[in-house]
Amino acid sequence: MKRIVFACMALLMGTATFAGGNGPKPKAETATIYIYRTGSWGAAANNWAMFVDEKKVCKLSNNRFIKVEVAPGKHRVSSKIGGIELLKKVTEIEIEAEAGKSYFVACNVKQSLTRARLEMTEVTKSSADKQMEKMTLDKCQEEAETK
């Protein structure tokens, strides 16, 4: 019985080691949240201010992504567009982050006659990989990394 338990544990540890793929690995004590915005011609001029736990991270542009390292626990990702607050809806999503894991938030612009909002959805890594394939890091994070 001990041999079976030991064999199962060894197998699980071995598969966990190789499950991550070739992408960037988050630090073991933090989690990584990738927030990306797919292209939308009608809303291409709008840059949405992205917040994590009410702290402004970046203004997210079309076909770009941002990367945020967070401590384990609950985190609220929200967005706002600039200008007058009349008829504007703040959108948000909550992520329960675990250390060493990556999370992906897809952002899509939804427009009506009176307002535009950024709809956020948590997606799997495989879905995000397909959508983020040709995206680059948003300029606001590029500038922060070069300073």
Residue ranges and their predicted role:
Residues 6-9:
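Sec-dependent N-terminal signal peptides
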Residues 14-16:
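N-terminal signal peptide c-region/cleavage motif recognized by signal peptidases
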Residues 1-4:
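Positively charged n-region of N-terminal signal peptides that target proteins for export
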Residues 20-147:
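Short loop/turn and low-complexity linker motifs enriched in small/turn-promoting residues
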